[in-house]
Amino acid sequence: MALNTGELLFTSSLAELAQSNQAFSLFMMEAFTRHKNLDYGDICDQDKRINEDAVSSGGRIMSSYKLPDELTEHCRDEKIWVITEAENQDGNRLCTTILFPSEY
């Protein structure tokens, strides 16, 4: 089952980094694909259960992916977050945002 993620958004700093660093861009897209396929990355078991409940109840879903060592020197954080907003009243998820934790 793939998650309906709505429109994909990035913070401006992630967009700039993805434009200038192909390896980061690939990592970011791989993280998004994992999130969409319900692989929440580097989160604790409790947060995985919360995400699993949110998939069926329409709540917000959050994943976290640790950057490979070769990318950390280019980034302000050691991971990125992928957040899909909760369903609206029509049952649609309107957007998913990729960001650094420090931008939250």
Report residues per predicted region:
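Short, compact, well-ordered microdomains
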Residues: 61-104
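Compact soluble domain cores
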Residues: 1-70
